[in-house]
Amino acid sequence: MASAEEIQRLFDDIQHLYGKGPDILISNAGYGKRIRDIADISIDEFDYTLNVNLRPSFILSKLSLPHMITYGWGRIIFVSSLAAHGGGINGCHYAASKAGLHGLMKSLATKHAKDGITVNDVAPAMIGETGLIPDEKVLEGTAGDVRNIPVGRLGTPKEVANVVMMFCQTGYLTGQSVLLSGGLK
């Protein structure tokens, strides 16, 4: 969904079907190859990672905000990553893309709080049941090894959804990132 044209068509369809833009935007794009050494990350891989993880959230926010401002209410929630805060098992290209998302969240939250719009992010790490971690054995010996997670298990998509719902329901919480990592740093 990195194409601005595709995203614009999506918004046109929403406008046509519902007669208005979205009140709540949840941007949950995620891509990242586990390439630990910067020397092994090609410029194309770096660009692709930012184009998937950061660019669509910018475009979606840009298209959502006018409607939210008009109605004086809105929620924008980005699904970021522990990597945005310097942790995780992916490379610096992934961390940079998610840190960019965190910066976008902070900037939009400050600018649009007065408009009745909250902007936050949930920063999960080591979430199972998504297909991204096919087997806990893959993680053995890495920073994401389940034995390194203080709660002793992977997180679940439902736990991520619970944080997203909290952000949707809470108008006094903006500019915040909830690290959902089982205590992993």
Task: Provide a role label for each language-model segment.
Residues 36-38, 45-47, 133, 145:
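Substrate-binding pocket helix/loop in short-chain dehydrogenase/reductase
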Residues 61, 97, 105:
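Active-site helix of classical SDR
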Residues 66, 110-114:
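Alpha-helical segment proximal to the catalytic Tyr-Lys
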Residues 73, 153-180:
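C-terminal substrate-recognition "lid" of short-chain dehydrogenase/reductases
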Residues 81:
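Residue(s) in the substrate-gating loop at a strand-loop-helix junction
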Residues 113, 118, 173-176:
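Short, small/polar-rich loop/turn modules that mediate ligand/substrate recognition or access, typified
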Residues 114, 124-148:
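A glycine/serine/threonine-rich, flexible loop-to-helix segment
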